[in-house]
Swiss-Prot record:
Olfactory receptor that is activated by the binding of organosulfur odorants with thioether groups such as (methylthio)methanethiol (MTMT). The activity of this receptor is mediated by G proteins which activate adenylyl cyclase. GO terms for molecular function: copper ion binding; G protein-coupled receptor activity; odorant binding; olfactory receptor activity. It is a multi-pass membrane protein. Cu cation binds at C203, M256, R261. The lineage of its organism: Eukaryota, Metazoa, Chordata, Craniata, Vertebrata. The chain crosses the membrane at residues 26-46, 55-75, 100-120, 134-154, 197-217, 238-258, 272-292. It comes from Mus musculus. This is Olfactory receptor 5AR1. CDD domains: 7tmA_OR5AR1-like. Disulfide bonds join C97-C189.
């Protein structure tokens, strides 16, 4: 069909997770609870770290920023998703779609670099303990975080420009619950080949550069742990990394599954649930992952609520 016969798309319509009205109510209640736990957990973690001087260390500075970016990208998606569960017409304007997309991409890609910075911090703490205060000074930590947010900003601009400079002049129905790359590319009436290559390359660079930093950091950490003679010392060293490894595995595993594939292999209905996992569930789990076995966080929480730590 001649593309000139199509009208230019000025708004999109989400299909959402389900079209069943009863399931929509159930999902609204479930995801509202999940999002509330997410907000309470991440805001609570930020407040705890800011207010307790015992947590004013590089490790918790990075954890505070992780909670911030988790809160950022989940809040770019969840409120709109919850509202759509209660409405029949899930319409979003072209500009609002671009804005949602931009904030989501910016925070997610910033998180990649925050996780890499956390891995580097663990490497220095375990492998270079005598030089820790110099290598992880306040200035270094600040530069690492500013660099993470700058990388997120650059990625935001690049992704948004590449995706929304395409022509959308056919169907405006997004088979998803938010504005994401694969369903948007599927709707474009432009030739998306070059954009797909550039987007894939950008995603690949961000993923693999940060994974490489994490992998190298943990390779040195593993060597250092093996050299520790006492079993107690090995366990203590490994316990400081266990939470971060869990968070990294969950986050990167899902993101790589979602984005580092050609669009021909996408099943949009199936991928919606993978998107739910990393946009809503992982941000909720991170405060739990990083605090459940952390004595410092538990002690700070007890102090905050006025209970003396044991």
């Amino acid at each position: 069909m001649d593309k000139e016969n199509h009208s230019v798309v000025t708004e999109f319509v989400f299909m959402g997770i389900t079209q069943d009205p009863q399931l929509q109510i159930i999902f609204f209640v479930v995801f509202l609870l999940v999002y509330l736990v997410n907000v309470i957990g991440n805001v609570g973690m930020i407040i705890l770290i800011i207010t307790d001087s015992q947590l004013h260390t590089p490790m918790y500075f990075f954890l505070c920023n992780l909670s911030f970016v988790d809160l950022g990208y989940s809040s770019a998606i969840a409120p709109r998703m919850l509202a759509d569960f209660l409405t029949k017409h899930k319409v979003i304007s072209f500009s609002s779609c671009a804005t949602q997309f931009a904030f989501f991409v910016g925070f997610v890609d910033a998180e990649c670099y925050v996780l890499a910075a956390m891995a580097y911090d663990r490497f220095v703490a375990i492998c270079r303990p005598l030089h820790y205060s110099t290598l992880m000074s306040k200035k270094v930590c600040l530069v690492l975080m500013l660099g993470s947010y700058f990388a997120g900003l650059v990625s935001l601009v690049a992704h948004t420009s590449l995706t929304f400079s395409l022509s959308y002049c056919g169907s405006n129905i997004i088979n998803h619950f938010f504005c994401e790359i694969p369903p948007l590319l599927a709707l474009s009436c432009s030739d998306t080949y070059i954009s797909e290559i550039l987007l894939f390359s950008l995603c690949g660079f961000i993923e693999f550069s940060t994974i490489l930093i994490i992998f190298i950091s943990y390779a040195f950490i593993l060597i250092a742990i093996i050299r520790i003679r006492s079993a107690e010392g090995r366990l203590k060293a490994f316990s400081t990394c266990g939470s971060h490894l869990t968070g990294v595995t969950l986050f990167y595993g899902t993101v790589m599954f979602m984005y580092l594939r050609p669009t021909s292999s996408y099943s949009l209905d199936q991928d919606k649930w993978a998107s739910v996992f990393y946009t809503i569930i992982i941000p909720m789990l991170n405060p739990l992952i990083y605090s459940l076995r952390n004595k410092d966080v538990k002690a700070a929480f007890k102090k905050l609520i006025g209970k003396k730590p044991q």
